[in-house]
């Protein structure tokens, strides 16, 4: 092993562990590698508990990232694509496919339990191209646009602001600004609860969110 190049070692390391359909690459004993959440998801599959399929990126990727000038392992991209393909096969839908899009949640985890400290981004896979297909499939435009605005809010907060290391403008984070826009919209339309908003309301707010993100963070929400 000592004569292997860094590239060769990188290619041979397993960075992505699959779970789903009652099988899993990992086990409950692998919390140091998969984090507590990833290890438990693997174990639940081994126990036959119905769990939506997915995959866990190992804690080693985080260590590699910080040990290598914030660069990711070369083989991670291909391993992720393979894991996503296998997840698509189990679910019977495809990520980014306009007619029947696969949506995924991205949940952070750690070797030690940290309740309330870890971030989550839901509904990844919803875009202007995939929204019509999901509306057609569900027959519920309110559900879809509500899910889309949640994606926009979480992605802007977790990825575009916090992960990018941006300081909140005037001490007010982007998530708080977007939540204020919802309250303003409710007040203008004499709504009391979020449940009063229609699909058209959430659609309109989604576009308003994008403008606010551009103005506040100086970047476009990726569609």
Regions found by a protein language model. Name each.
Residues 3-223:
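Nucleotide/phosphate-binding sheet-loop regions of phosphoryl- and nucleotidyl-transfer enzymes
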């Amino acid at each position: 092993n000592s004569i292997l190049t860094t590239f060769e070692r990188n290619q041979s390391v397993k960075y992505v562990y699959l779970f789903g359909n009652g099988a899993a690459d990992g086990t409950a004993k692998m919390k140091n590698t998969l984090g507590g959440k990833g290890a438990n998801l693997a174990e639940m599959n081994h126990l036959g508990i119905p769990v939506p399929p997915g995959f866990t990126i190992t804690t080693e990727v985080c260590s590699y990232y910080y040990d290598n000038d914030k660069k990711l392992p070369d083989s991670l991209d291909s391993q992720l694509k393979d894991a996503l393909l296998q997840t698509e096969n189990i679910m019977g839908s495809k990520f980014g496919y306009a007619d029947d899009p696969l949506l995924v949640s991205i949940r952070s985890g750690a070797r030690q339990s940290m309740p309330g400290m870890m971030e989550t981004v839901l509904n990844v896979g919803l875009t202007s191209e995939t929204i019509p297909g999901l509306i057609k499939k569900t027959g519920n435009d309110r559900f879809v646009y509500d899910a889309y605005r949640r994606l926009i809010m979480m992605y802007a907060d977790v990825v575009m602001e916090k992960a990018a290391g941006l300081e909140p403008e005037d001490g007010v984070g982007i998530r708080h600004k977007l939540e204020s826009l919802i309250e303003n919209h409710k007040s203008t339309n004499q709504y009391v609860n979020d449940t009063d908003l229609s699909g058209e309301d959430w659609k309109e707010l989604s576009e308003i969110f994008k403008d606010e993100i551009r103005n506040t963070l100086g970047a476009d929400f990726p569609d």
